């Protein structure tokens, strides 16, 4: 199991939101690059970035912060949030991120994602599944669908996806522990590599994930 620190970016700051609510924000740092370096120095082997401005508005406001992070760390960096066009993906991968996470695109622009999975590898394109009551949410969690999360993962596995970042929205930012049952079902039914996101706050949570 690999522990991946996450940095949520909003207006160039490191923040945390409660259940993705934009008005429930806590700012942790005004220097994302320094935060990334701190994580690497602590032993992180990979970083996960979320562009919240991109997720909420469809266009990012954190490109300078992302560039600075990439310049200052030597470990792989993956990013998600607002990546909804082929150009968005091309730009991020050209910047030097190791992988991009797509969610809304997989629902609304499946033809574009199919094309990208032929252009790049299944390790460079990661499927982001944001789940509320086991149904996929998109557009920065503002829009709900009737798509069941496991079926969604299986559909994209058939197109070449190898890895899923699974977020239980009800747990995100709450420090209440991950949804182990949902994560176990996702792993067992799909055979994909699963990144557990949302609610993880303690060594005990990590031990449970490792043993589940």
Spans of model-derived segments:
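Short, acidic/polar
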Residues: 28-40, 84-90, 144-155, 206
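Short, well-ordered coil/turn segments that N-cap beta-strands
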Residues: 1-3, 43-46, 73-77, 97-98, ...
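Charged helix-capping and loop-helix junction motifs
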Residues: 60-67, 142-151, 176-184
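Conserved, mostly hydrophobic/aromatic
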Residues: 8, 39, 47, 79, ...
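N-terminal beta-alpha supersecondary unit
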Residues: 13-60
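Glycine-rich, proline-tolerant flexible connector loops at the mouths of alpha/beta enzymes
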Residues: 46-64, 165-177
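Conserved anion-binding
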Residues: 12-15, 19-23, 93, 97-172
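Catalytic cores of alpha/beta
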Residues: 70-73, 77-100, 181-212
């Amino acid at each position: 199991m690999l522990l991946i620190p996450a940095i949520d970016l909003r207006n160039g700051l490191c923040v945390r939101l409660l259940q993705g609510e934009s008005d429930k924000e806590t700012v942790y740092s005004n220097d994302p690059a320094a935060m990334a370096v701190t994580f690497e120095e602590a032993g992180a082997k990979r970083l996960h970035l979320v562009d919240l401005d991109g997720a909420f508005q469809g266009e990012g406001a954190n490109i300078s912060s992302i560039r600075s992070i990439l310049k200052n760390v030597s470990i792989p960096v993956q990013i998600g949030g607002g990546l909804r066009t082929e150009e968005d993906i091309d730009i991020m991968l050209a910047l030097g991120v190791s992988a991009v996470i797509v969610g809304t695109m997989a629902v609304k622009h499946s033809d574009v994602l199919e094309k990208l999975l032929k252009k790049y590898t299944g390790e460079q394109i990661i499927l982001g599944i944001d789940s509320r009551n086991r149904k996929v949410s998109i557009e920065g969690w503002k829009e709900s669908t009737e798509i069941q999360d496991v079926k969604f993962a299986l559909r994209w596995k058939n197109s070449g996806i190898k890895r899923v970042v699974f977020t239980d929205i009800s747990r995100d930012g709450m420090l209440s522990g991950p949804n182990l049952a949902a994560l176990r079902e996702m792993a067992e039914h799909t055979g994909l590599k699963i990144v557990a996101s949302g609610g993880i706050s303690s060594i005990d949570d990590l031990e449970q994930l490792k043993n589940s």
